[in-house]
Amino acid sequence: MYDILIKDAIIIDGGNNAKYQADIGIHNGKINKISKNIDAKNGKRVIFAKDMYLTPGFIDLNSHSDTFLTLFTIPNQDSLLRQGITTILGGNCGSSLAPLVSEDGLKAIQKWTDPGQINLNWLTFQEFLDSLKKIKIGINFASLVGHSTLRRGLIKDEFRELKPKELKIMANMLKTAMKQGAFGLSTGLAYSHAKMATTKEIVELAKIVKGFNGLYTTHIRGEAEELIPAIEETVDIVKKTGVNTEILHLKAMGENHWPNMKKAIEIIEKNKTNINFDIYPYTVTGSVLYILLPDWVAEGGKTQLLKRLKDPSIKEKVIREMQEKKSYEYDKIIVATSPINRAFIGKKITEIAKAQEISVEEAIINLLLISEGRISIFLDTLSEENVKAGLAHKLSFIASDSAGYNIKYYQKKSDLVHPRCFGAFPRFLNKYVEKEHLLGWEEAIYKITYGPAQKIGLKNRGLIKKGYRADLVLINPNEIADKGTFENPYQFPRGIKYVIVNGKLAVDNEQITGEKAGQILKRA
């Protein structure tokens, strides 16, 4: 007797193979049988799936549910399940929740959320995983080690290169975490506290990851005028170490830099290194407000940043540099979160400046001072053509760069989250696959299932194959669509009919069940 029997589904198996029709029997959390004409009497629960696509559960290799802390505050991760995500990889962009050398390691997540909202009662990576097991979560979770978490925990807010002894300590901490189940290392080299990390420092740590056959993911040093040097640095790291590498959310920000996207991909292709990259299906990105400032302003951390901006002479210098450089199109930047003054949420930076009768640059500085540096923004700065080229490229995977939420979160707060938190994968499948035929369904599903599973190093997930874990998604291809907007992102998508996590129904006919069947995954 099967726990769940799915009848007459069109199977897209995740391996970029041709579709076929079959029944699937699920028992004890695994795919037990794939065959035609399994008697419906053999299923405790039978789902009739005629004309629907059955795929492996989607694997999001660029998630921030851990460092945004929603994995704890919203453990069912409704918005991810409703878009078909069954497994996420956390610890990205240089920030993870373990291992912690000191409480300073957690400062790396302050730009996104308040660490004080949960009780962090761990230090080691193993203790972190053990704590997660106690709360029960709706999706499978794997994690990298954040480079900035290690670095900041060790030298706090000091803006300098590491001493040899400090690098050795970091290396030993990384080794221990890898032994305890971490899947690899991530860097956030664009953020202020990692800017002083040398290529040599990253190379030494990447060698350790390579020794464990782990994964190195990187938010590269720059995505505008710095894009090409940042790509070249990544290629250099891979050539020196051979480490399996993923460039997170590859993009060229700002119209002046759009041609660099093609150049960046050509550099990756030409060098034939073990590098992939991920793309999200939007031209609007999200970040923190302070990235609009010259790099030197953020040196030494938030305290130093605010201290500098309060100094009238330094403030004047910052404004002058911003006006001379003109790196961003300010009329395309919207305030997404503003914890202290919520009246700014949803407004363009230019609107705020106009209302106050000051320059946009001064408005940005004032916003940072009022909010104590904790404002996030949306930037409409990407090229649609570049997004398409990235999505269709043979080296790309699709990732959300998001966190999991639910509708109740919006009822408590007025913050705007990026709509990718609710609809990245349905948008990709609807807009770029079903409607625009940018790529076929088989290749598209590979890019969000077995491809990421192989890249991360997940075992027995990402394929519809006998003996594999029963993480599955049933899709109505005629209905699939995202609904969230930047004005109202808190809307679940259409067309993801059923989601099964480890053999349990997490979404039943587009309704969240609250089953919480997710598992904490460790590197084998």
Residue ranges: model-predicted function:
Residues 9, 29, 51, 62, ...:
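Divalent metal-coordination and catalytic microenvironments
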Residues 1-5, 10-57, 74, 482:
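Histidine-rich, glycine-flanked metal-binding segment
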Residues 176-233:
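Divalent metal-binding pocket/active-site signature
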Residues 71-183, 271-273:
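Divalent-metal coordination cores built from histidine and acidic residues
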Residues 53-77:
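Di-metal (Zn2+ and/or Mg2+/Mn2+) metal-binding site signature of metallo-dependent hydrolases
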Residues 311, 389-396, 400-401, 472-519:
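C-terminal cap of metal-dependent C-N hydrolases
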Residues 132, 138-140, 144-164, 170-191, ...:
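Active-site neighborhoods of metal-dependent hydrolases
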Residues 11-23, 375-382, 386-387, 436-445, ...:
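Acidic, glycine-enriched loop/beta-strand segments at the rims
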